[in-house]
Amino acid sequence: MKKLLLAAGVLAATVTTSFAWTQRQPLPVAACQVHAPYGFPVSARAIQPICRQAYLVAYDAAAKIPEVVMYSLTPPNALGCVPRTNAFVADQSIQGGPVPDDYAGTGYDKGHMSPDGDLSWDVQVEFESFLMTNMTPQAGSLNRGIWKLLETSVRGWAVQRNQSFTIMVGSIYGPGDKVIGKGVVVPHGFYKIVINNQTNEIAGWAFPHVAPYPNLGNDLTKFRMPVAQIQQTAAVKFAFPANGIELAPGKEWPVDFGALTNAKRAKCGANAEAN
């Protein structure tokens, strides 16, 4: 098993993209401890860590997707006001990495692991949310459906509880999975683990990746999965608070989407949306 912390990072020269924003060098991996406060994940795969200001990527160069992305979400950051740019661009710190054209004509969305809505609190951070090393191929009916609902729910929990969260978002993939573009693996599942940093409560969800995605309504509890099972399925080992309390199956923190929208509009303007 290889510890992400010990893997070698790759630095890139400053590069200006066609979207007229300048890519910054990745930070030292140790700087991303804020996004992995309980410890870095451990994987048997050959993983390259990429530390950004707002998130940590465990990038799998062989699959050209992130194995997992970790980040912290605070109440103020959950109400960011930077408009979405859709500035998808290759990560210049990765040689031979994924590019937007790998997804062209495939029917798959360029699906964020660390979502733009959680990273809209700073202009440069919002741009960095669109680096292709933060993307996986996702069916639009999942990416824009119940997956998006979970992303919005996490922001609601942060704002309404006035508490910070540590979030792990990852791909479930392996031999035999579909490949698009020039070697980009399409995961057969995705997961999200959320830790409340104040209460040490933990909850996990896992989603099979099928297209079109069935309409199962807005009940996220149908996708709850014990974190031990997620780790076994995804072949990744995470660290958790020593006194962590996993929420019972079928239980989640309540969220008021109307109140979240009102809070966003109060901060960002009348046309702002929570999602």
Where are these regions (language model features)?
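Sec-dependent N-terminal signal peptides
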Residues: 6-11
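N-terminal module-boundary/linker segments of secreted carbohydrate-active enzymes
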Residues: 20-64
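Positively charged n-region of N-terminal signal peptides that target proteins for export
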Residues: 1-4
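N-terminal signal peptide c-region/cleavage motif recognized by signal peptidases
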Residues: 15-17
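Domain-level detector of nuclease and nuclease-like folds
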Residues: 92-275
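Short, His- and charge-rich active-site/binding loops that engage polyanionic ligands
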Residues: 49-110
